[in-house]
Amino acid sequence: MRQAIFSNPNDAAEYLANYIIAKINSTPRTFVLGLPTGSSPEGIYAKLIEANKQGRVSFKNVVTFNMDEYLGLAPSDLQSYHYFMYDKFFNHIDIPRENIHILNGLAANIDEECANYEKKIKQYGRIDLFLGGLGPEGHLAFNEAGSSRNSKTRKVELVESTIKANCRFFGNDESKVPKYALSVGISTILDNSDEIAIIVLGKNKQFALDKTVNGKPNDPKYPSSYLQDHANVLIVCDNAAAGLKSKL
């Protein structure tokens, strides 16, 4: 793993945004980009929007695949990841709408939806760069503790810690947080991506970062430890996330 530590979240976001811009601009073909939601990547998206408006990068030849979506939420729901991505990113850049791929939380046939998502990724050959974040207890996308290294896109049940962490987006009411989601699997990320970049911000991510970098490799208790099994991973964090334990 390669690591880069910054004193504050803004500098970390700027570094990773510029990193993504350089990758897109140096790729003469379609660039396939994996994307997360949540608070950690918001700063990156803001920087990418600014760069797009300034003409420093275009997304006309970029194809995106998002990591996950809540099961049962319509794309128009304010808490859906469809809504988040369009509100925070897609509505403000020049990406063709047909290039955007997000799992459908209202799919009539969940198994078919997940299988088709895997097929769509394969159709593009490889994901050039998969951007991700870490859950407080080391989950990657919605791959919770116990997830297999060979897991693919599927329906997952959210654990209590994830529900607690996400309830702030639902008026701090845990009962309103969906209990299930659709998520790419560990294999989907690791085996289809040429490079993985992880943004880790804040003191509450110290534990997850430590398990990711210094923990037992391929430990199902901490799915982010599977990242040690990939040859090209960049971790970008702030001082608060790095803490004293992380040997970065």
Swiss-Prot record:
It catalyses: alpha-D-glucosamine 6-phosphate + H2O = beta-D-fructose 6-phosphate + NH4(+). The keyword Hydrolase applies. Induction: By N-acetylglucosamine. Keywords: Carbohydrate metabolism, Hydrolase. GO terms for cellular component: cytoplasm. CDD domains: GlcN6P_deaminase (cd01399). Its EC number is 3.5.99.6. GO terms for biological process: carbohydrate metabolic process; filamentous growth; filamentous growth of a population of unicellular organisms in response to biotic stimulus; glucosamine catabolic process; N-acetylglucosamine catabolic process; N-acetylneuraminate catabolic process. The keyword Hydrolase applies. GO terms for molecular function: glucosamine-6-phosphate deaminase activity; identical protein binding. The active site is at residues 68, 137, 139, 144. SUPFAM superfamilies: NagB/RpiA/CoA transferase-like. PROSITE patterns: GLC_GALNAC_ISOMERASE. Monomer. PANTHER family: GLUCOSAMINE-6-PHOSPHATE ISOMERASE. Belongs to the glucosamine/galactosamine-6-phosphate isomerase family. This is Glucosamine-6-phosphate isomerase.
